[in-house]
């Protein structure tokens, strides 16, 4: 995912990482912990949003982590779902069909996104309520 983040940033895309885990969840990160993990994992997102109350996640219907959302230049949802077509952890993710990269590429070319929604995969979001 970091390679896709870096690629997107090079195209001027704003990449927001939203942590909707409740404060009592093992997945919750405060700002200092998140920053440390960003550095260790070489995360290239534009910004991190602490959504511990889950308002943003619930607004978008976020079910898993990751659950990807691509918003177009007008602020409309253009794609949502999995980052790619490989839910299993084995294998090279660079060989997967990357739905997020495809959506961004099509939007930048003013084209039509072929796959606008897929089923996200990963661990369930642990909302506080």
Where do the language-model regions lie?
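Short, internal strand/loop/helix patches
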Residues: 16, 35-72, 77-78
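Structural microenvironment flanking redox-active thiols in thiol-disulfide oxidoreductases
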Residues: 1-40, 52-58
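Short, flexible active-site loop motifs that bind/organize anionic cofactors or intermediates
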Residues: 24, 47, 90
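Soluble non-cytosolic domains of exported or imported proteins
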Residues: 28, 47, 94-98
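Generic preference for well-ordered secondary structure
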Residues: 32, 40-41, 88, 107
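Thiol-/selenol-based redox modules, centered on thioredoxin-like
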Residues: 70-129
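Sec/Tat-exported extracytoplasmic proteins
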Residues: 5-8, 41, 60, 108-112, ...
